Amino acid sequence: MSYLSNRSASSSLAVLVECVVSPLLREHPAPICFELNVPLELTTTADRERLSDLIVSLVRGSLAQMPEGGELTVTGCLTAHGVELEIADTGSDVESRSTQLSLAAAAIGCKPQWQNCPQGGAAVTLVLPFSDAARKVA
């Protein structure tokens, strides 16, 4: 499912996340408190269609863990290794959910790192490599 076009241009990660997550939140039957902590100027050169598909998969997994509602937080920052994106929720812990996204993540050159959140729920962190590193993976 594609939410954005122009796959190769650098784009705002905040705008991409907002465009992908908003429809999923509207479809969810229970109330979800969504917090987006991604600077508007933070960009990525990752393939937007593939990244959108990966975010959709991760957010759907999070929402499935919160049938009665909860909190979903997406945080992004720039690191020495690339752009880091974390999706955290107040659903069940890591051991209670499917964490297999190797093909979707490998397509954009990242490996998801899963961890339990101290307040409950789980988080997955993606490091989107800089464009040179992404080209080597492809």
Where do the PLM segments sit?
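A residue-level detector for a conserved hydrophobic packing site
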Residues: 51-52
